[in-house]
From Swiss-Prot:
InterPro entries: Ribosomal_uL5, Ribosomal_uL5_bac-type, Ribosomal_uL5_C, Ribosomal_uL5_CS, Ribosomal_uL5_dom_sf, Ribosomal_uL5_N
Keyword ATP-binding: no
Species: Synechococcus sp. (strain RCC307)
Function: This is one of the proteins that bind and probably mediate the attachment of the 5S RNA into the large ribosomal subunit, where it forms part of the central protuberance. In the 70S ribosome it contacts protein S13 of the 30S subunit (bridge B1b), connecting the 2 subunits; this bridge is implicated in subunit movement. Contacts the P site tRNA; the 5S rRNA and some of its associated proteins might help stabilize positioning of ribosome-bound tRNAs.
Swiss-Prot/TrEMBL GO biological process terms: translation
Family (UniProt): Belongs to the universal ribosomal protein uL5 family.
Descriptive protein name: Large ribosomal subunit protein uL5
GO molecular function terms noted in the UniProt entry: rRNA binding; structural constituent of ribosome; tRNA binding
Length: 179
């Protein structure tokens, strides 16, 4: 059963009861997932930018947008308009497919994985996690990568607070660390 179908048929009714909501539309849901990779070396190395665009597209199934510097910063040797990263926003079916792969395939492949931190909520029910290596995703072949690079994954929900957001992600199968 896909995550989207499981959310509609099992998770939504359970959260409605657990969080004492009177209306189904009050139940928190995932709005979007943002995958971002900052590339400091992209200013000097164009190949790293191309490799990152390809990797993020392979992982998410959607072509990422190249983010550019808004201002020149001499200390970082970047000028305005230089590429400094890649980002992609997933919604709908692609979002649910990505979340399912992240929770069930990618996170368990992290070395010494004991669960994700419960402290990474932002106060409004949104969750951000940093991934140190892109090779945890099964779509990325170890032979084809030129360097190990991480990424930030933000899960935006309609939850009003962290407790609701955590309840939603826990029901979806997010492996939280037992403190």
């Amino acid at each position: 059963m896909s995550l989207k179908k499981r959310y509609r048929e099992a998770i939504q009714p359970k959260l409605l009861k657990d969080l004492n909501f009177s209306n189904l539309h009050q139940v928190p849901k995932v709005v979007k997932v943002t995958v971002n990779r900052g590339l400091g070396e992209a200013a000097q190395n164009a190949k790293s930018l191309e490799a990152s665009v390809e990797e993020i597209a392979t992982i998410t199934g959607q072509k990422p947008v190249v983010t550019r510097a808004k201002k020149a910063i001499a200390g970082f040797k970047i000028r305005q308009g230089m590429p400094i990263g890649v980002a992609v926003t997933l919604r709908g079916d692609r979002m649910y497919a990505f979340l399912e792969r992240l929770i069930n395939l990618a996170l368990p492949r992290i070395r010494d994985f004991r669960g994700v931190s419960e402290k990474s909520f932002d106060g409004r029910g949104n969750y951000t996690l940093g991934v140190r290596e892109q090779i945890i995703f099964p779509e990325i072949s170890f032979d084809k990568i030129d360097a190990i690079r991480g990424m930030d994954i933000t899960i935006v929900t309609t939850a009003r607070n962290d407790e609701e957001g955590q309840a939603l992600l826990r029901e979806m199968g997010m492996p939280f660390r037992n403190n």
